């Protein structure tokens, strides 16, 4: 497991490929939500530029709005420390133009914020 968030929602980001030409990481993203008799699960692959990853971590460390997006704007993870909210969304379009979209919003307490911050700061960067 490369990056794992377990509170307030389960999100796993595993690196499956690296591109040194355009510094970027291909992540296998898994999001699992289970509460109040509701269950949703998302599994997809997304390319994220290393610069976007660094900016996301930097903003989190400064207590600012932090946004992690893939290169196609199909995946987004937003940590808003002022509002105390974690938002996520995943979208995939098939070859016929059909779209599947999953998204969620979760309240964050201080422990969850610190756990997310630790998970991203502990990721060993190669760039």
Question: Can you name each region flagged by the protein language model?
Answer:
Residues 15-23, 55-58, 76-81:
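Short linear motifs in intrinsically disordered
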Residues 1-37, 42, 46, 112, ...:
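Charged, alpha-helix-forming regions
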Residues 53-56, 60, 116:
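Short, structured motif recognition centered on aromatic/hydrophobic residues
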Residues 7-15, 57-62, 70-74:
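Charged, amphipathic alpha-helical segments
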Residues 43-46, 60-63, 78, 118-123:
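Short C-terminal domain-edge/linker segments immediately following a structured domain
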Residues 46-53:
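Core segments of alpha-helical transmembrane spans in multipass integral membrane proteins
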Residues 95-127:
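Mixed-charge, glycine-accented linear interaction segment located at domain edges/termini
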Residues 64-107:
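Amphipathic protein-protein interaction modules
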